[in-house]
UniProtKB/Swiss-Prot annotation:
Primary gene name: IAA7
GO BP term, pick one: auxin-activated signaling pathway
Name the UniProt record assigns to this protein: Auxin-responsive protein IAA7
Pfam families linked: AUX_IAA (PF02309)
Induction: Not induced by auxin.
Chief location: nucleus
Compartments it resides in: Nucleus
Biological source species: Oryza sativa subsp. japonica (Rice)
SUPFAM superfamilies, per database record: CAD & PB1 domains (SSF54277)
Extent of motif EAR-like (transcriptional repression): 43-47
Length: 300
């Protein structure tokens, strides 16, 4: 009995030792799995998963074995790259065959152009955007015009327009206001006369005679005027146009020049006259009187 009990103890010890020494327990297995996972996830210059360096560390190989494993890995990579290049070449040849098969005659290509893809589509879109935006961009001359030059040009243009507007307004004023002031030497009061009521110089001279005959008589000496009242009423102011009488009719134009009435046609006279004056013939220059007499003789 004693020997049997000792043999049973040895068997149980062997089993316990075998289970502890020969086969690893669950706790040790779990620890090994964690270490492998950490080695797999650690950062390195190689591919994820540990690579040949992790395998060399686990197996305890020497440097020669690691170099041989690296060479083998490089050979595997070369085989893979050659296989990839071979697959790429077969794919390219297959795509070229399809393109040649789908390619038709030039008429069909013109009738059905291939759709633009990739860079061609992007280039066409950019060209379309450029064509649509180009008309909206302002055209700038060279050299550029400075601001003060533009202001000078606009101001000069505005001044010219203003001058033209003033001339047009003056012409309209002449047409709309035909009443002209008329003054006579020796008579302090002036009168106004409507030139549109006349159509010749003779009618104008008769109207001037009627306007100033009574006023001129009132300016004389009262005693002389009372003694010869009836005779003065019959005396008319004659020689206004040719300078042969006591008074001569002269007009002033818009330029400030004094001209004898009757030297220009009637229409020009009406458009250029600014003021009429009845001046004494003795105060006028001899050249004006001579030109007036020559004009009268030519008309006769």
């Amino acid at each position: 009995m004693g020997e049997a009990s000792e043999s049973m103890k040895k068997i149980s010890r062997g089993r316990l030792g075998g289970s502890w020494m020969g086969e690893p327990s669950d706790h040790h297995r779990h620890g090994d799995e964690q270490e492998e996972e950490e080695k797999t996830l650690e950062l390195s210059l190689g591919l994820p998963g540990g690579g040949w360096r992790a395998a060399c560390r686990d197996k305890g190989t020497t440097t020669k074995h690691s170099i041989a494993a690296a060479a083998a890995a490089d050979d595997d990579d070369g085989d893979k790259s050659s296989m990839l290049s071979l697959g790429y070449s077969t794919l390219v040849s297959h795509s070229q065959g399809k393109a040649n098969k789908n390619k038709g005659s030039p008429e069909e290509e013109e009738a059905h152009p291939p759709p633009a893809t990739g860079n061609n589509a992007l280039a066409s879109n950019n060209n379309g955007c450029f064509q649509t935006r180009s008309p909206s961009t302002p055209v700038v001359g060279w050299p550029p015009v400075r601001t003060f030059r533009r202001n000078l040009a606009t101001s000069s243009k505005a001044s010219l327009e203003l001058q033209n507007g003033k001339k047009a307004a003056k012409a309209e004023e002449i047409k709309r206001a035909p009443f002209i002031k008329i003054n006579m030497d020796g008579v302090p009061i002036g009168r106004k006369i409507d030139l549109n009521a006349f159509d010749s110089y003779e009618k104008l001279s008769l109207a001037v005679d009627k306007l100033f005959r009574g006023l001129l008589a009132a300016q004389r000496d009262p005693l002389t005027a009372g003694a010869k009242d009836c005779q003065q009423e019959d005396v008319a102011i004659s020689g206004l146009l040719d300078g042969t009488g006591e008074y001569t009719l002269v007009y002033e134009d818009y330029e400030g020049d004094k001209v004898l009435v009757g030297d220009v046609p009637w229409g020009m006279f009406v458009s250029s006259v600014k003021r009429l004056r009845v001046l004494k013939t003795s105060d006028l220059s001899s050249s004006l009187i001579t030109s007036g007499r020559k004009r009268t003789a030519a008309e006769c």
